[in-house]
């Protein structure tokens, strides 16, 4: 996982890590973790921090070493990449940029992708994703649909 990071990213993470490694022993406490991540432009919730810490701090000693920290940051960055990809995909479908994907927009994109859909098939796709029942797909519904695939 950490091998997908660039040298610049690793250097940046090392610098931030060192700032919070007060005694220079190569570990930071779980409490300091949130501060480190915020300094790198991430904004984890308390719940996300707990999950990350539990995943990383295998021995439960309350500290995280640099290799563990790198693995965790690589995971976090991978997650935000896929979020960006979903936003871009939504823009492709939302031709008029009104924040909704209509049946016509869905049919148009699917046709361009080589999928000739009947009226019923398009309606069915909209129905499956359309949580609030307004006949079109908003961004939240689109994200749910993409994540469930």
Curated annotation (Swiss-Prot):
It holds the Pfam family EF-hand_7. Ca(2+) 4 binds at residues 130, 132, 134, 136, 141. Ca(2+) 2 binds at residues 57, 59, 61, 63, 68. Residues 8-43, 44-79, 81-116, 117-149 form the EF-hand domain. The keyword Repeat applies. InterPro entries: CALM/Myosin/TropC-like, EF-hand-dom_pair, EF_Hand_1_Ca_BS, EF_hand_dom. Ca(2+) 3 binds at residues 94, 96, 98, 100, 105. Keywords: Acetylation, Calcium, Metal-binding, Repeat. Ca(2+) 1 binds at residues 21, 23, 25, 27, 32. PROSITE patterns: EF_HAND_1, EF_HAND_2. Calmodulin mediates the control of a large number of enzymes, ion channels and other proteins by Ca(2+). Among the enzymes to be stimulated by the calmodulin-Ca(2+) complex are a number of protein kinases and phosphatases. PANTHER family: CALMODULIN LIKE 3, MYOSIN LIGHT CHAIN 1, 3. Belongs to the calmodulin family. This is Calmodulin. It comes from Blastocladiella emersonii.
């Amino acid at each position: 996982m950490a091998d997908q990071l660039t040298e610049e990213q690793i250097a940046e993470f090392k610098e931030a890590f060192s700032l919070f490694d007060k005694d220079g022993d190569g570990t930071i406490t779980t409490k300091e973790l949130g501060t480190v991540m915020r300094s790198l432009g991430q904004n984890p919730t308390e719940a996300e921090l707990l999950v990350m810490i539990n995943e990383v701090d295998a021995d439960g000693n309350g500290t995280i070493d640099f290799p563990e920290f790198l693995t965790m940051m690589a995971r976090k960055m991978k997650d935000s990449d896929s979020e960006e990809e979903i936003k871009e995909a939504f823009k492709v479908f939302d031709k008029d940029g009104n924040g909704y994907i209509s049946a016509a927009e869905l049919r148009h994109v699917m046709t361009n992708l080589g999928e000739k859909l009947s009226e019923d098939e398009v309606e069915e796709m909209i129905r499956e994703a359309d949580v609030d029942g307004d006949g079109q797909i908003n961004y939240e519904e689109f994200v749910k649909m993409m994540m469930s695939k």
